[in-house]
From Swiss-Prot:
This is Cation channel sperm-associated auxiliary subunit delta. Auxiliary component of the CatSper complex, a complex involved in sperm cell hyperactivation. Sperm cell hyperactivation is needed for sperm motility which is essential late in the preparation of sperm for fertilization. Required for CATSPER1 stability before intraflagellar transport and/or incorporation of the CatSper complex channel into the flagellar membrane. Testis-specific. One of its GO terms (biological process) is spermatogenesis. Residues 1-16 form the signal peptide. It is a single-pass type I membrane protein. It comes from Mus musculus. Glycans are attached at residues 227, 419, 469, 535, 627. Residues 746-805 are cytoplasmic.
Amino acid sequence: MLVLMLAAAVATMVRAHTLCRVHTVRTGKVFKSNIQLQGDPLFYAFPNTFVLKNVCKADISVYLGQKVFLTIDNFESSLLPLTVPKSLAVGVPSITSAHFVSGSLVLFVISGKGYSYDYYENTWRKLEGISEPVSHISGDVCCFKGSFCLELSNNLFAYLRGGQIPGTNIYFSDNGGFSFQLMNTDKLSHLTGTLGGIFHLHSMSQVGVLMVENNLGTFHYMEYPLNHSMGIAFSYKNLLEVIMKPYQRGFMVLWNQKSILVSSNSGQIVEHVRLIDQKIFTDLDVEHANINIYSVASNAYELAFLVAEDHLYYGSQSYMGTYVIKLPHQPLWSTHTSIYFEDIGILQVLTPVADPHFAAYDFDKCTVNVQSSLMDEKLALQPCNVELLESTMINTMFTIDMNSKLKLSALMIPRKGENPTPLVMVSNPHALGFKANLNEFGNTFDGNSKYKLDIELKQQHHWGNSDFNFTASIKRHAISSVTVDIADKTLSCVDLKPLSTLISVGCDMTKKIVVQNKISACTMGILNPVQLQKNYTYTIEKEAYDPINHNGEAQDDLIVFYEYKDLGCPRLVYYDKPWKPVVELWKNGIVEEIMNAEYVISEINGLVTYSYSLTAATANCRSQPQNWSTFESDIENEEPFLWNRENYVSCHEDNKDNPLLWPNVEYQVLGGQTNNKIIFGQRNGIYTFHLSVVDPYYSYCNLNTIFSVYVHGALPVTKFQPLLTILLMVTTTLLTAWLAYAIPKQLRSEKGQRLLGFCYQILQLCLGVCFCTWLRGKLRQWLRPRRVKDQNRGKVRVAQKHPET
């Protein structure tokens, strides 16, 4: 019994000093196999190892080392080394960069050329558009659902690290690497030095360029408001690999064998990692410490690296700094060993093992439970000062549209006797601002206080407390992450990860506009909805419309098919009454408001029998307003609906380049600060309009809709000019009145008597002629029936003489 107790005690002591236990993954090798590798085996071009994780699919990874392996089950099966077909003729099959994109593709740079590999179909393809050597492909993967997030993931760069700027070619892709295009580098013309990298920094809605000159690295930015500033310079003696940490929080890791640097704000400040040693905090100088970093692992909140001197370091990365500690020693390192995070607080040490009898490699895996390892008393770490930090905002992407706001909340329960400080951070303060309040609202069963953190977010412009040059352009959509963390959290809070989510300051896809239809031509009995649904057509007269291509006048009437499914019953409008549509803004199927933004309309069939009630002068324009003629050249090129919020210029602002020269032209913008209306011409019939919101400050969405109206009450257009008709009527009336006076007076005179006698004779002659003509007509009518009867009698006699036999 005593022996058993001693054995248990020894086993407990051994476990206490062991980071992890190695187990070997070996599958599919029961029977002997003659499988041989097809193609050229790939290898990593650098002397270290690295495991690239697919951020959105946790079980899919690529191991880069002297051999390359791709797993879809987290290295839980034996694998063949990855090869590239000989038909691609890649030359030396060395990989300098790898990047996962959406779907089942991973992009590789092999010997200066780009290739894509579909790991489900096992197919390779050379990337299109890259004509010069490149060394790296960079991107920032977004894992939320939706087209907006997919668009972020599809933005990529391909570049040659170490290339001279200006001079080196940079390629970009907006379709997930299917094809690349040569980037216009005019914005980089002021930069000099060598290129350390170019990155999509979605956390700040920026493109960042790492430039190296005189052993100093500096991040430069291409978009306003950071395009005239740069990050703080840092030491850059040897080429650094750049890791973009996931979830668009702005965290980066820059490392090589002799250096490891971090940034929490997309490169604006790059600093050293802080080392914790017996409660003493110092900057980790890798070169001075005489260690060689061999493999680096990171996830959204953690960092670890394995050094060739056989030590493993672990740390957490937050906005307050990156702190690491050397874990208890255990022999782990070999030239093939690499590390990666399998989950929060779970670090995997991976070593491929060759099999002399099979082509497939096995894997030695050693799982490090970081939380358990940090409990070692020798590390002297303080316990976590927070018991709970949770919120419903995680794993959800939110949208803040123009003039909107968002409210979030989080629950915090501190450790008993502790008073931690919550921290709220946004990665893009140029676009997104917030206000936070912390309130105590009760206790747990064991007496701990509960706190609720309320956060209100809206565009930085609308808080009104930032310098104009600090805020991003309000017209341009942006992205920012929001993170809730504990400012004074200890390193032992491994399982208490920060709360983070992504905010899109942009178009709310649940919004739409609808033109109100309270009185329609169907409800008033003018049109029949049943007939409208039966392929109803109507005719537009050639005089009433212009061809869509504006090439001369219409030659024929236009027959239009009415789209009842999209348009419904037309709204009823009286032709002579100025009218404008009432536009409703809907969100998530609910009416939000009656829209008062500026918008424009266009009759989609080319009808021109309507006008506007205001001119540039009566609309109080201070510059020449835009109108549809401004965009006619683009319409001829069959471009989409072109007058929108992106190219609209208000005439109510001074514009030296476009002064008000023609104040009497039509003002063709509806809504906003004017009461402009539509005036329909003297024509009854259906009009089908396309409506587009052009106000750039109403919504980031391109809000548009189509609707129809039926104009009634117009009398037919007269064939004569009204002025000519009135002139003829007045002349005829005056002439008749004059004749009624002049004729009786003239008849009393001798000359009048002679004229009267002459007229009498003419009348008698006419009557005689008419009477004779009448008698002759009557005689013909009487004689004609008699001839017909005589002819019929003759035919009867002939028939009697010659009867049929």
